[in-house]
């Protein structure tokens, strides 16, 4: 062992003193199967090179041929994103290749050390602008940058009919950014350049590191029509046809490119195995279903190209022309900040407009289709594609981030995100024209059709030579557009309330209701987690004031505004288990509680919020007889189910809301009055939260409120369609039906009316709280450091959206957060905790609450906003896959929906098992104790103790 060490040391020492031509060989920096790489110095200039030293004695004839092929290829290739060959020297025992020195190492090291990149001074600015995600791979801006440069190199190779055959992160080397190289302090050692153009990026961003493709040892000239059959490359990145020992062509490189892109996005290869046989089995078993980690945020267009590259059959893969023309390759990188953004703006302002979440046009005599005007509360910045960047497809099984700039079709967060939660790039509507994909740094702006037409006309008429003047009047135009859009938010609330008022005023429906025609709005904020009280009055926003068209009710009337409906639907004794579960979920699962002394006593104890009331089980006459009454009952069930799901989402949002906006001072001491030592507005109290934490909470609360609004809006849409049919048929408005049918129809009508009143009240409350959260988010974004990507100064005017503020500072969600991803993660967390407690036989009623709430959350995730009357789940999934692009519904692709369904079914199964267990326990406890015997007594089991054994 000692002799070996001495020999190695002396060899290294001799190597350091060895000169090869005008170069000296220094320390070793890498080692492969057949070659060792050293850092070298060009003696005349002192510049650094990488010297690849190959020991010829270790090579057979075929490997020598490969080496000479590599040399010939490198001599003919001059491209900024391909490592250049500077010189080549051959001796009797070695061949030395002097190549460009890439001081940042390879891409695999870059990915593994992403959390420490800021320690390198050449990368510090990059990390500050585009922070790396806590989990997963690289920031999506960096991913797109590297992918563009790799694609540029591959396109150069394809033009010359070369196939690399060993594309992998270890063969993708990095050098500092051109900007850094240009301003590097003189005097220190520099990397030797093959030419001036070798450090000028052809694509990408000048402030980010440059990527160079290296190691052409397995490369060869292979025209498109030719096939090879040599097993080459690294197994983890090999194409399946190579692993199968089949003939292959240049399309094998497409697979390797897809694996590299996947690893950049997620931090790990798409398939891992201990040998190539198992690797091939995994690829075959996967059936081209490429999954992305659920905790990551990935843009839709990036996921699209990965899935098109990673097809196990070469003929199914994207072609090279399609690959080079893909939006991720050709379009500007979204999410740039600071000086990375283009300096010149197009005279025509590019605006991505998000259409209504439901394009279906349904009209009733009373109310036309209720537009989702709350969409104007939020938008998604196409900025950075990191966990804290826009999509982003959220994925999140969600999830998800395409958009008009090639960014994730919001995208996200998640991803997953549904169109109902607008923030995620992967969830933005897919019906966008390719011509919109021109501006590299803007976010979708919610506009109505009329506003869109007016603004498009203005943009099209703008002269080309008015670039400067257009920038100077942008703010004024934004003010005008914002003023117009602000009315639309009120219009949404007005339509909701108008429809609810008409139903409440109907004589037949109103008989059973004691509520007034104009139900007063309930403006409350939910009690904080440790509060001893429930609903508290908060100042009403202008949105609700204008929408209602009247003065706001006082606190007492607001608190009891829904009490009559709760009594109409059912008495407290008829509350179902699900209603109790939903009410208890906010306490046990979401961590929100109220004083135990206020529960179970008094006619109407204060509550955190009005949970959706339960109804008595319908009688048997309403089930399955095929008459119109059956349809009424079905509509009732659908409306109530959707309202219940919205209630669960609302409860989750309230947790975020209470962390974000502290209670008024009077609430901190229950009903005992305010604390004289505490003063100030609750909106100004951050309760110790950092600015970034406030931004995060605001975004999460906002997307959850918007999801709740979408479910409430859907309930109202269904009720509106039912109301229109009934008015045409005269059933509710005064028509006569025989006997019990008339009674059943009236009962169904009353239940729908009650649901509509509840939805109206909740809608107004959620809309107001969403506005408060929006204001909080805008305020927090202004307080971020000026160099932070989320700061308003780092966003273009086109990416701003105003939803009711008097200023021009709009709301931009700068992260990939989606409601679906938040809900999915929360449901998993609750079900896992419940499963652990169930196995331990601890708190079984609490387990039932957790299971039930998780089920409702996952059902809300799967809710299809484009579908009024839901179909059966299996049919819905199948038809949704066929009709939607990429099999996506609300931004959640078909594969992710299947995953959610599997989890949902498992939780339902656990809930059924739990109920059986609880029933058995209750039955056992209700049994009378066994009668005592003078001769024998048992200790509760079937095995008698020694003292109880009868004498023989």
From Swiss-Prot:
| Domain of life of the source | Eukaryota
Gene3D superfamilies registered for this protein in UniProt: Transferase(Phosphotransferase) domain 1
**Protein kinase domain spans which residues?**
23-329
- Region listing for Disordered, in residue ranges: 331-478, 510-573, 783-806, 920-952
Q: Which UniProt keywords apply?
A: ATP-binding, Autophagy, Cytoplasm, Kinase, Membrane, Nucleotide-binding, Protein transport, Serine/threonine-protein kinase, Transferase, Transport
Q: Which family does it belong to?
A: Belongs to the protein kinase superfamily. Ser/Thr protein kinase family. APG1/unc-51/ULK1 subfamily.
Composition-biased stretches (Low complexity): 933-952
Instruction: Output compositional bias ranges, type Basic and acidic residues.
Output: 338-347, 356-372, 429-439
Naturally occurring in which organism (per UniProt): Botryotinia fuckeliana (strain B05.10)
Please give the function described in this protein's UniProt entry. Serine/threonine protein kinase involved in the cytoplasm to vacuole transport (Cvt) and found to be essential in autophagy, where it is required for the formation of autophagosomes. Involved in the clearance of protein aggregates which cannot be efficiently cleared by the proteasome. Required for selective autophagic degradation of the nucleus (nucleophagy) as well as for mitophagy which contributes to regulate mitochondrial quantity and quality by eliminating the mitochondria to a basal level to fulfill cellular energy requirements and preventing excess ROS production.
Q: Which gene encodes it?
A: atg1
- Uppermost EC category: transferase
Q: Name one Pfam family in it.
A: ATG1-like_MIT2
Q: Which residues bind ATP?
A: 29-37, 52
Q: Where is the active site?
A: 166 (proton acceptor)
PANTHER family assigned to the protein according to its UniProt record, in alphabetical order: NON-SPECIFIC SERINE_THREONINE PROTEIN KINASE (PTHR24348:SF22), SERINE/THREONINE-PROTEIN KINASE UNC-51-RELATED (PTHR24348)
**GO MF annotation terms:** ATP binding; protein serine kinase activity; protein serine/threonine kinase activity
Its chief place of residence is cytoplasm
Quaternary state and partners of this protein?
Homodimer. Forms a ternary complex with ATG13 and ATG17.
Q: Which GO terms describe its biological process?
A: autophagy of mitochondrion; cellular response to nitrogen starvation; cellular response to potassium ion starvation; piecemeal microautophagy of the nucleus; protein localization to phagophore assembly site; protein transport; regulation of autophagy; reticulophagy
Q: Which cellular component, as a GO term, is one annotated location?
A: vacuole-isolation membrane contact site
- Provide the protein's localization: Cytoplasm; Preautophagosomal structure membrane
Q: Which CDD domains match?
A: STKc_ATG1_ULK_like (cd14009)
Q: What is this protein called?
A: Serine/threonine-protein kinase atg1
Q: How does it sit in the membrane?
A: Peripheral membrane protein
């Amino acid at each position: 062992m000692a002799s070996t060490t001495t020999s190695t040391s002396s060899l290294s020492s001799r190597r350091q003193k060895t000169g090869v031509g005008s170069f000296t060989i220094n320390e070793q920096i890498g080692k492969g199967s057949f070659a060792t790489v050293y850092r070298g110095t060009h003696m005349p200039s002192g510049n650094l090179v990488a010297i690849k030293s190959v020991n010829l004695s270790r090579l057979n004839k075929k490997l020598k041929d490969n080496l000479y092929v590599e040399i010939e290829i490198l001599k003919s290739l001059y491209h900024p994103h391909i490592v250049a060959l500077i010189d080549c020297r051959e001796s009797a025992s070695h061949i030395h290749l002097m190549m460009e020195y890439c001081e940042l190492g390879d891409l695999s090291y870059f990915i593994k050390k992403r959390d420490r990149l800021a320690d390198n001074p050449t990368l510090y600015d990059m990390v500050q602008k585009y922070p790396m995600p806590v989990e997963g791979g690289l920031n999506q801006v960096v991913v797109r940058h590297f992918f563009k440069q790799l694609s540029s190199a591959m396109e150069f190779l394809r033009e010359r009919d070369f196939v690399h055959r060993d594309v992998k992160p270890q063969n993708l080397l990095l050098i500092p950014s051109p900007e850094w190289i240009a301003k590097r302090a003189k005097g220190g050692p520099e990397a030797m350049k093959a030419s001036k153009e070798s450090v000028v990026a052809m694509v990408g961003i000048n402030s980010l590191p440059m990527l160079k493709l290296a190691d052409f040892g397995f490369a060869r000239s292979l025209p498109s029509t030719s096939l090879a059959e040599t097993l080459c490359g690294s197994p983890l990145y090999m194409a399946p046809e190579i692993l199968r020992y089949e003939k292959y062509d240049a399309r094998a490189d497409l697979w390797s490119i897809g694996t590299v892109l996947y690893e950049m996005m997620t931090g790990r290869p798409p398939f891992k195995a201990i040998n190539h046989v198992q690797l091939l089995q995994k690829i075959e078993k996967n059936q081209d279903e490429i999954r992305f980690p659920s905790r990551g945020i990935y843009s839709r267009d990036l996921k699209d190209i990965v899935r098109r590259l990673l097809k196990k059959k070469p003929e199914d893969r994207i072609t090279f022309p399609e690959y080079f023309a893909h939006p991720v390759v050709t379009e500007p990188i979204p999410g740039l900040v600071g000086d990375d953004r283009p300096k010149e703006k197009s005279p025509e302002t590019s605006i991505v407009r998000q259409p209504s979440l439901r394009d279906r046009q349904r009209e009733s005599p009373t109310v036309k289709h209720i537009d989702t005007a709350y969409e104007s509360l939020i938008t998604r910045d196409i900025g950075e594609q990191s966990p804290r960047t826009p999509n982003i497809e959220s994925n999140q099984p969600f999830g998800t981030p395409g958009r008009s700039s090639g960014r994730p079709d919001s995208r996200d967060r998640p991803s997953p995100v549904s169109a109902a939660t607008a923030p995620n790039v992967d969830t933005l509507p897919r019906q966008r024209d390719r011509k919109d994909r021109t501006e590299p740094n803007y976010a979708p702006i919610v506009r109505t059709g009329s506003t869109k037409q007016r603004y498009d006309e203005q943009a099209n008429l703008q002269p080309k030579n008015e670039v400067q003047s257009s920038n100077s009047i942008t703010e004024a135009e934004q003010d005008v557009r914002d003023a117009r859009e602000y009315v639309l938010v009120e219009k949404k609330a007005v339509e909701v309330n108008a429809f609810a008022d008409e139903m409440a005023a109907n004589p037949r429906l109103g008989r059973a209701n004691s509520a007034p025609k104009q139900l007063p709005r309930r403006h409350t904020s939910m009690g904080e987690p440790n509060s001893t009280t429930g609903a508290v009055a908060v100042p009403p926003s202008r949105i609700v004031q204008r929408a209602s068209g009247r003065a706001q009710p006082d606190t007492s009337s607001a608190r009891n505004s829904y009490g009559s409906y709760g009594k109409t639907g059912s008495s407290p004794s008829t509350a179902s288990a699900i209603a109790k579960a939903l009410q208890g979920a906010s306490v046990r699962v979401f961590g929100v509680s109220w004083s135990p002394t206020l529960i179970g006593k008094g006619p109407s104890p204060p509550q955190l919020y009005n949970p959706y009331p339960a109804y008595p089980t319908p009688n048997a006459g309403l089930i399955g007889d095929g008459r119109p009454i059956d349809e009424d009952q079905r509509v009732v069930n659908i409306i109530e189910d959707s309202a219940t799901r919205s209630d669960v989402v609302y409860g989750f949002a309230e947790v975020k809301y209470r962390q974000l906006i502290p209670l008024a001072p009077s609430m901190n001491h229950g009903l005992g009055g305010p604390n004289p030592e505490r003063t100030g507005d609750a909106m100004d109290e951050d309760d110790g939260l950092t600015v970034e934490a406030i931004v995060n909470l605001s975004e999460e609360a906002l997307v959850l409120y918007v999801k709740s609004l979408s479910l409430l809006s859907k309930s109202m849409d269904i009720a509106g369609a039912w109301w229109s049919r009934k008015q045409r048929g005269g059933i509710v408005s005064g028509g006569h039906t025989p006997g019990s049918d008339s009674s059943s129809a009236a009962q169904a009508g009353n239940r729908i009316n009650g649901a509509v009143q509840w939805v109206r009240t909740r809608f107004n409350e959620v809309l107001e709280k969403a506005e408060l959260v929006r204001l909080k988010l805008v305020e927090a974004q202004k307080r971020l450091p000026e160099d932070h990507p989320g700061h308003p100064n780092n966003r273009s005017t086109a990416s701003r959206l105003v939803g009711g503020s008097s200023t021009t500072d709009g709301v931009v969600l700068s992260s990939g957060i989606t409601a679906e991803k938040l809900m999915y993660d929360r449901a998993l967390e609750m079900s896992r905790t419940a499963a652990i407690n169930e196995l331990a036989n601890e708190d079984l009623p609490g387990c039932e609450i957790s299971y039930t709430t998780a089920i409702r959350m996952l059902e809300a995730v799967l809710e299809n906003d484009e579908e009024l009357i839901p179909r059966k789940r299996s049919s819905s999934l199948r038809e949704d896959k066929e009709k939607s692009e990429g099999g996506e519904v609300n931004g959640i692709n078909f594969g992710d929906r299947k995953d959610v369904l599997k989890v949902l079914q498992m939780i339902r199964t656990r809930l059924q098992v739990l109920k059986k267990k609880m029933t058995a326990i209750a039955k056992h406890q209700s049994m009378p104790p066994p009668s005592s015997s003078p001769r024998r007594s048992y200790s509760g089991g079937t095995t008698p103790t020694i003292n109880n054994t009868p004498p023989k």
